[in-house]
Amino acid sequence: MIDERIVTKAIVESYTKKLLSSLELDVAICGAGPAGLVAGYCLAKAGLKVALFERKLSIGGGMWGGGMMFNEIVVQEEAKALLDELDITARLYTEGYYVVDAIECVSGVSVKAIKAGLKIFNLVSVEDLIVREN
């Protein structure tokens, strides 16, 4: 039988620890769409302490829906190197254009970003901005 007290305590303590460790950051990113996720990945990979805040339950923005509500997206040649770095499959459609499974793309960049050290907080709205010197 599962002990709900242990489950609740584990969730609350773990999340609180993650949140408290993110009170001082090098970079805070608002919005976990494709741009926010890639920015978080690149900054965390570079060794910065980064957290990403998303007001919705799910991250990835509209990319889940792909193009025309088909879960396929098209990227151009300039993005191919990043997709390769993220181990996301890109199939050549025609010269300079690649087709990518939208679900693989959102999932792939999310996993790589988290593994690089990005902390993601969904269901959090950001209302104020503080910029500190240095």
What are these regions (language model features)?
Residues D87-N134:
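Feature captures the FAD/FMN-dependent oxidoreductase FAD-binding
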Residues A28, A44-W64:
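Glycine-rich FAD pyrophosphate-binding loop
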Residues G31-A35:
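Glycine-rich Rossmann-fold phosphate-binding loop(s) that bind the pyrophosphate
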